[in-house]
Structures are given as structure tokens and as C-alpha cells.
Amino acid sequence: ENSINEKEVIAYYPGGKELIDQYDLNGVTQLIYSFLHLRGNKLAVDNKEDSLTILHLVSLKNKYPKLKVLVALGGWGGCKTCSDIFSSAEGREEFASSTAKILEDYDLDGIDLDWEYPVIPGVPGHKYQDEDKDNFTDLIIRLDNYLTSQHIISFAAGGFQSFLDKSIDWDKVMPLVDHVNIMSYDLYSQTKTGHHTPLYSVNNESYSVDSSVRYLTEIGIPKSKIVIGAAFYGRIWENVPDIKNGLFQNAKFKRAISFNELHLLDDGYNFYWDENAKAPYGFNKDKNEFLSFDNPKSVSLKAKYVIDENLKGIMFWQLGEDSPSNGLLEAIKNKIYSNE
């Protein structure tokens, strides 16, 4: 069994090379630079600035000996040509070989695939097709062939039913990857308020960390390959009626807000805790706005869940939205590395 101090604490990071130095990365096991994209059939670093950032992140391994640094492909809107390119054996092969070269050139520790999404619609207008599922499997097989056993291969999975059911051939993919990062956030709709990153589902229409984990364990995925997600940002809805403090009401998604900007919200917000979901939320009566987010208490409970369920670890999107002190990463580390 994983001992407590072997849990993964995985930070996605899309920021520049200066911002990262505000954060204490002791106890962070993986830093995933986000994102690289396809250029033709190849994995490519977008520009010189990104290249310098990656070099800086890799240099942090001197300061933090336990840190591994990965790069991620794609992201929301960042995988427009993935379905097309990965539909040919040549495209998959060239991607795998180019990935191996980038990892070697930059002294990186691995690749995280964040294709949103194989088989099912993601960004409007981006291609998806049934063949994506088998093509993804073959892509992983080829990556496994090109990379060394020291290299990490992971992928990000949607935490909602259609992705879990349709996008991935779990039986074939999971033996070849180190773990799956479940994106257990953005789980509620654009047109109704709710918890976007709850630990537990509270009604039959809500997804959660736990619902994704249950799904994967029930189809035989080992817990030692499951990483759950926390959100370092909140989601705000507007036009929310003053019923039940705004929870589960018809409304309109307005915007996201970083955890480190929550203090800028105006004074009209009252905050509440949903004991069933283990999730905080806020409601502003004057403005008819509803906020769903993760706070130190909720991420600490997610970290406790990782320990109690003996999962591989916890990841979050994204580090640059955290407060450098008394933030969410600190709360996660306090729980993961406490000797309880």
C-alpha cells in the first residue's frame, strides 16, 4: 500500500516563469506545464517564452529534489486538430517520437494528455469521432514504446458520465499509464447553479469526485492509478433567484474567479457549507449572484479522501490562482503530509 507520504500532489501550471517563484513547492510531486500543442503531427512548444518557462520549471528540480516536471498537450480549446492528426498511424507515430524528443531536450519527466475530448463534443466546432477511442489507445501504446520506464504518462479525464462511458478504452489504456487525472471540476451546468467541484454527489444529476472514483473502481481500475481534482477557482452565476441561498436554481453562468481574487468580491456575499457535498458556496442577494468554489476546508477533505480511499493522489487546476500563503495548496499539503 502507498504510505501517506507517497501520495502525488500534482500542480497544473499555465503561467509564466516569474509567477511560479512566489509559491513554496515543497511537497509538490509533479508540476505540469500547460499547454503544448500540435504543430502538424508533432508535439510543439508554442514560442520562445514558453520554452524559457519550461527551462525555468525544470531548473526548480535542483531546489526541490522530489519534484517532477511534465508538459501537457491540449487543454480546453487546445486540441482542435487532435481527432484528425491521431486518426492516422503516421500522425500517432510522429507525435510519440516528437514527444520523446521534447522530453529529452528539456530534461522533462513526462507527458500528460489533455484532449478534450475523444469521441464526445468538447469545444464547439472541434472535430470528434467514434474512432477517437481506439486511436487514443494506440497513441498511448506508441508513447509507451518511445518513452523510458522513468517517464510518466498520464491523461486528464472528464469527470462526467459521457466521457467516462465513451471516450476511453479503460481496460487497454490504464495498464500503460501511470495514472489518470480526473477533472472533477466544472461539473455543473451553465444554466443552473450547483457545486462545480464537490467531493460527493447530492442528487442524481450531480457529478462529483466520489462519483468518478466509484465509476472507475467499479470497472476495475486500481485505486493506485486514480488522481482526483480540486479547483483553485470558483464559478459565478448571475440572475439567480433568492431561493435556498441560490443553490440548484435556474441561472446563467457569468464567469470564473481565481481563489486568490475571492477577497475582491463585494461585501454582499454570504457564505454557506453543504455538509452532504462537502462543498462551500456563496450567495449575493443584492446582485443575485451564486458562487461555487473550493476552500481550504473542502480541499483538505479531498486530500483526506485520497488517504482514506488509498488513491494515488490529488491534482488541481491551477497553481497560479492560489494564494502563496494560507492558500489551497497549503491546506492540501497539511493534510497529505500530516501524520494522522
PLM features: residue spans?
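Glycan-recognition patch characteristic of GH18 chitinases/ENGases
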Residues: 2-103, 329
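Short, acidic/polar
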Residues: 13-27, 87-105, 161-172, 213, ...
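Conserved, mostly hydrophobic/aromatic
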Residues: 31, 71, 113, 180, ...
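Substrate-binding surface in catalytic domains of secreted glycosidases
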Residues: 39-52, 97, 118-264
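Glycan-binding loop/region signatures in secreted carbohydrate-active enzymes
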Residues: 73, 230-305, 331-340
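Folded extracytoplasmic luminal domains of secretory or organellar precursors
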Residues: 91, 103-109, 117, 124, ...
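Short acidic, glycine/proline-enriched helix-loop-strand junctions
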Residues: 122-136, 149-151, 274-276, 323-340
